[in-house]
Amino acid sequence: MPSAQTAAERIAELRSEIDAHNYRYYVLDEPSVPDAEYDRLFNELKALEAEHPELVTPESPTQRVGGAALAAFGQVRHEVPMLSLGNAFEEQDLLDFDRRVREGLDLPAGDLFGDGAVVEYSCEPKLDGLAVSLLYENGHLVRGATRGDGSTGEDISANVRTVRNIPLKLHGSGWPAVLEVRGEIYMPKAGFEALNARQLESGGKPFANPRNAAAGSLRQLDSKITASRPLELCAYGVGRSDGELPDTHIGILQALKGWGLPISRELKLAKGVAECRAYYDAIGAKRDALPYEIDGVVFKVNAVEQQRELGFRAREPRWAIAHKFPAREEITELLDVEFQVGRTGAITPVARLKPVQVAGVTVSNATLHNMDEVARLGVMIGDTVIVRRAGDVIPQILGVIAERRPTDARAVHVPEQCPVCGSAVERTQLIKRSKGRESVSEGSIYRCVGRLACQAQLKQAIIHFVSRRAMDIDGLGDKIVEQLVDKGLVRSPADLYCLTHEQVIELEGFAEISTRNLLHAIDASRKPSLARFVYALGIPDVGEETAKLLARALGSLDRIGRALPDVLVYLPDVGLEVAHEIHSFFEDEHNRTVIALLRERGVEPQEQGDVHPEFAACATLPDLLDRLNIPHIARTGAQRLAERFGSLEAIIAADWLDLRQVERLTEKAARSLRDYFDKPENAERARLIEAQLREFGMHWESERKAAEGLPLAGQTWVLTGTLETMSRDEGKARLEALGAKVAGSVSAKTTCVVAGPGAGSKLTKANELGVTVLDESQFIERLAQLGS
């Protein structure tokens, strides 16, 4: 046991450090250490104060909950303090809690399996968000507040009123005249990912995790910002109540649910500590599948009378405990950074860490993604870093604890030569191509230029090529691929089809039967579907679904290989980024050679032939003009130009006077169009696109000819609202394939309107005009009747 003087010094250090962390966490919304590190510091302080009670002061962090409220908000005094819960980190902590509950209720002690007098506990996940108090008077929401320091919080009434699942007026009847609801406001995982995507798109700083995002959103002085954030409430209890409530915790939560307040769908009653342990294991197993982040489960004595009997201690109720999951964030030392080479040659930094337990697993490596991420984190070799591991996700470094940086820390540098093959490493600037705006820098990537001469790239390329979703060559596992490459038997995917019996049987682990089986599997893969073959090629950004789309839409490898980016983007879900990746892949001489060798050696993907009718009907002259991104020519202007001139050549040839005759085309737009096509490269680009559309059977003139005699020829349809079984683009394509014209507005000439959920003014106008309206199920039935 340390002396009183030594203990006093350590206690002072701990209080200072904890107070600094509290300030960053509660006031600045910028946590500086993981929860697990904070808990260790707090528990050390708590233990020292227990050994030296004479050193306890009212200002100690152990004597209060959290930190002070932000000065920018009004202050709210909690009539019933919002206390935090004690924590259980190990199974024994939970058993000790149950023992203390039994002793407090004067019940017989149970054994390790909970035998003895049974205590009933409510069980629910511990959501990772911000605790709030919602005050209802006569059923109306009158105030919302944060927990703050447990006694005083922040008045965030305007902000909580923007959270969509918080009722502004209680439902039903029987609620107390005054009811204070306690709950957690959190951000679902999907909403968090979408918010961060928007932050990055707008140049903003992404949030570290959903908890920070929820807390930051609720502490906005402008409630309009809060309203734009995907926040939700989960009620978990009641503070003040002027009226009768059920006599169990679960009963109270069910009452809240009846009054319109959301509660956990995972709420459960456990009879005894053994069932609590089973609940903890069950929630832990489904943790990653839940739509929100949790960091443990909460157990509460279910009977309210027993809660009163057990009472409180200084910081927490005696009748509740939070059983935490193993920490998903920890701190450790960055020992080194090594570089790996991926299938496309990308050089990726990998952190080598001092081994640390994270979420129950020893972690010694973590991804750093790329050098832009290294720069963003400001990480150096020797730093103390925060590491996170969640589910099957590769551990990653979240941040650096800068104040712990050693004096001999070293910067991270990309090697000039590939660490595997020694080829040069080149830096490539990534470009984001977006319709209607200039290309902008999206960071950079370092690549080994060795291609398949680099064994790391070759091995990964072969592993991908033979995988189950690609060529599906059974028996060619990673270790066998490594042998084939290391022995020089395979230098490209095409070499697989030249392997002999003599070569294979010499491989480690092979005998006569396994050799015959592997050669048979290779031979059986010579006629893959076109989609499988395209996926197997390993085109950057082309996954299994995109490969299926390319095969279905374009029908042949030759067509896919020759398609211009401006034509590829007519396919649903293929944007400019992916279109350029596909085009660049097939333009590459080396890739063309590998494909030619595969075909020479008997690999023939099974092609479907023509362009699929749904996609053949996608292109229109207005759409082509719109996709050229001519300044000041919007979609409506493109439509009027097409109606006035009828062909691309006529538009290219139109002079100033001709253009000024186009209805409602401004002088600025006419001048911009003329300036655009006066540049030969622009006119050539437009002609090349049109020529390929015509060659592929996707030209609008082909569509008009094909439409003659189709069942919906001459009809005009409108799609409005959300379609749940298909995208709007797919619905449009299927209608156009049947000869219909799909318009963007409803008029007296409209034949039919398809209205999904969320249909608005178009549906109203259709009803006013007496236009036929179909819901989605009727629409699908009509398509089926017409053979689509």
UniProtKB/Swiss-Prot annotation:
Keywords: DNA damage, DNA repair, DNA replication, Ligase, Magnesium, Manganese, Metal-binding, NAD, Zinc. GO terms for cellular component: cytosol. The keyword Manganese applies. One of its GO terms (molecular function) is metal ion binding. Its EC number is 6.5.1.2. HAMAP family: DNA_ligase_A (MF_01588). This is DNA ligase. It comes from Stutzerimonas stutzeri (strain A1501) (Pseudomonas stutzeri).
